[in-house]
């Protein structure tokens, strides 16, 4: 049968005799409920929209290849990095964060940077952003951030007041806010931005020696950004500009590439680090912990069906392979639960069987998961009729002790420790970042901040000016001027203690 001569069937293979005219009682009569095809189509249509992601709802994705270019086996025995030249299939998804599925691509927002590597030891998901830091360092605040940047419960509109009230109520957010208000808060598209694992992770080698690492992905297309005015003009013509750019580039054979690097910190260095090395609001300075090249990934194949491969792509930081591991980063620890849990709600417990999520490097035929049943369990025969318990006399579900990780270093008593008593150095790094900007770039930070804070209350504006001033007096004065506020009217020595306690 020719491709253009496919004949319509129902979902269970029955031929459809008429796809335009319903079955009725007479030519002008009411619809008959025995019109099985109509019932099937409408009931499926009523259920075809799945829950969108709570964050990162609007996204674009592509398949590609990761290639090792430098030997890092002294740090890790992960097979993906076992030899120079080794290639691994992968999938990448880029996204905005705050907007819904129908939001414009060009918003002043963080961009998600999620990678899935199909290794022979299972899928490795690295769920990052285009910024190296985040707004806070304890995952208990994540629900509040989500609500603050989404729609107001009364007006159902995005609220700069809610957004900035939250951001300025959490002083450690200034580092991320500074990046967001800078040129890099509005990437031209997904191809022209860097990516970061953001969190601190760890690696271990054959000797069981552990090091702490941060992942960096540097675009080989160069960094390009838009101003607010440029972005607004483009959004008026094309709300999918970033998605279109990525898709068209790959279709035209202009495959985007990113180089992968790591920063490495030993356990001894971590003990003596001046700040908490697992604090997601801070970076490790490259002068102290230089970038080490690892490899390069290239995106070279567009999905054949967006829903199948991009909308149903499920990432979770718990998807990690031998040789790689986690860290005490409190935000990472929270995400270890929330991501997988969200995917099970959104896609079901068997979402690992969806093609884009399948562990292709292992092969379904080589897997032996203990989980059974659940909606849409079909791919592996539900493990057949063998034992569904352990131990059993068939020897099924044997552990693989050769993959046991080295001991994870922890200490201390279980307690709700006040993070602000441990570290209140919120402003040093954003101050250094501000001073690295050119004069023109600083002016754009001031302008972008004023644009973003339009309609925000005076007390919240004062709070932000105070934080900026503590990072660098020039920063605070510039923001105050852009907001048309006399800096002499701002309490520059105040604190956020009372505000924070209200969260």
UniProtKB/Swiss-Prot annotation:
Keyword Cytoplasm among UniProt keywords: no
UniProt protein name: Catalase
Quaternary context: Homodimer.
Example GO biological process: hydrogen peroxide catabolic process
Organism: Staphylococcus haemolyticus (strain JCSC1435)
Alphabetically ordered keywords of this record: Heme, Hydrogen peroxide, Iron, Metal-binding, Oxidoreductase, Peroxidase
Function: Decomposes hydrogen peroxide into water and oxygen; serves to protect cells from the toxic effects of hydrogen peroxide.
GO MF assignments: catalase activity; heme binding; metal ion binding
InterPro entries: Catalase, Catalase_3, Catalase_AS, Catalase_clade1/3, Catalase_core, Catalase_haem_BS, Catalase_immune_responsive, Catalase_sf
Cofactor(s) the record lists: heme
Matches recorded under PROSITE patterns: CATALASE_1, CATALASE_2, CATALASE_3
Catalytic site positions: 56, 129
Catalytic activity line of the entry: 2 H2O2 = O2 + 2 H2O
UniProt-listed Enzyme Commission number(s): 1.11.1.6
